[in-house]
Amino acid sequence: MKYKIENRDDVERITTVGILAELPKCDKPEKGAIVIRENKNDIMEETFRGLRTNLLFMLGKDDKVVLFSSTQPGEGKSFVAGNTAVSLAFLGKKVIVVGMDIRKPDLNKVFNLSRRAEGITNYLSDPENVNLFDMVQHSDISPNLDILPEGPVPPNPTELVARDVLVLDLSLIHI
């Protein structure tokens, strides 16, 4: 018995989950992991435009939060979230990407940010003294895109994300 989902057929066979897009395998870019550019039409740009169109069609008018998740590290959630965010920003949507993979942060790589960038873990570790909005970084890719990176890997990631302050303060940045 096979326990690994390897392709679209596996997803369709064992789930009722709708597939919004199927991304082709791509070479890693030299700098960062953003593979789409404004006004280009290669296969990745078109694939992310298709994902964006399907996502917007699927979401309700007032739905403004999209969660990207996976079962294991290295499956591409930061890559897909980052490129989808850029695609939405190029459409004129205001977007903030919030890095919550605080065990193995990757947004710094995706957006070519400093590995020392402060982020949500700084805030969650000391919410009384750290301003959440000071952790947000403006993207040089689009004026419509901001990033709240994960921050340094904490010794207690589970406890940090379980804090009530997280839910309350993420509602402040809800666009």
Stretches found by the model and what they are:
Residues I173-I175:
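Conserved small/polar residues in nucleotide/adenosyl-binding loops
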Residues A162-V167:
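Charged helix-capping and loop-helix junction motifs
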Residues L148:
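ATP-hydrolysis module of ASCE/P-loop NTPase motor domains
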Residues G151:
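Flexible phosphate-sensing "switch/lid" loops adjacent to ATP/NTP-binding sites
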Residues L170:
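Substrate-engagement module of ASCE P-loop NTPases
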Residues L145:
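Short, conserved active-site loop motifs that form the nucleotide-linked donor/cofactor pocket
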Residues M1-K94, M100-T121, S125-N129, F133, ...:
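Short boundary/hinge segments that flank catalytic cores
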